[in-house]
């Protein structure tokens, strides 16, 4: 199936049904009262994250989605039937924004997460609601509300823990094949990868992470050159970036240091938050370098490249160094998850304390108000209309009543 990660659609929720203005018609009751029912609500439109989907191709060709209108109210206090809701299933990781306002409508970042994208209109009121002691036969009713109408942008950002960076032909697809069960196309020409590939790396029975391979970047990618710029968004949800560098390029004019710095610069131009993510270097294709030259080649690269958070020396083709790398990534991710869970627990505890304090303040205000009311009653300024005189005749009359 073709990989589509962006689409634009229009959603139109159903209008509410109109209320009814009708009157009872019964035998021997020539002028019955109002009995008009309310209109049904219009159908709403929901977006649902479905892990079984991995592309937005369905929404590229079906752009208009309209929910059912609510039925009108009837006589005998019959309410109109509500319009049926529509559920639009989308891949996990889909971000929905309003094209007109730029508002974030929903971020479907978990399987089964559901969000309303267009709310159906409320049904109108029947004339039964407008009956009063003054107007016993109202002819007034209200029309149903219009449902929401929106133009939406759907943007798929794949959910992965690790994102692979690198120039075309840096060995990213070979690496993901070596460490996971994913089988992307591998060839000895640039831009072999035309769409993101996901692979699950399992370090043991209970530990794993997801790695994303996007098409190679070239200089000017942030301005739209090459293919990689179309898919940089898929790296925004990752927790660490793995930058693969070809230390043994076939082109004698190629400069690994210049190419690596160009990739980093493209990240900075595209998104500052992406640029600031943890970024590790994987110096690849060491199997093509004579063993006695490897240490010098690596040292020369690191000296010219500058400071780096962490670096690893690997050969994706032979697997050398890959095991050490994936276990280091797993440990880093596990530590991050533990820290995130601790922060979440602390946040939950703080929210619970804040809620308890707010509840205590409300209770204190209530008790203060209650004491004030009691004090007013004792001084005769209460709401019962008495002036606090103990010799009130009404009180004496009450106390002199015989007990039954």
Curated annotation (Swiss-Prot):
HAMAP family: GTPase_Obg. Residues 22-43, 373-404 are annotated as: Disordered. Residues 1-159 form the Obg domain. SUPFAM superfamilies: Obg GTP-binding protein N-terminal domain, P-loop containing nucleoside triphosphate hydrolases. This is GTPase Obg. GTP binds at residues 166-173, 191-195, 213-216, 284-287, 315-317. It comes from Aromatoleum aromaticum (strain DSM 19018 / LMG 30748 / EbN1). GO terms for cellular component: cytoplasm. One of its GO terms (biological process) is ribosome biogenesis. Mg(2+) binds at residues 173, 193. The keyword Glycoprotein does not apply.
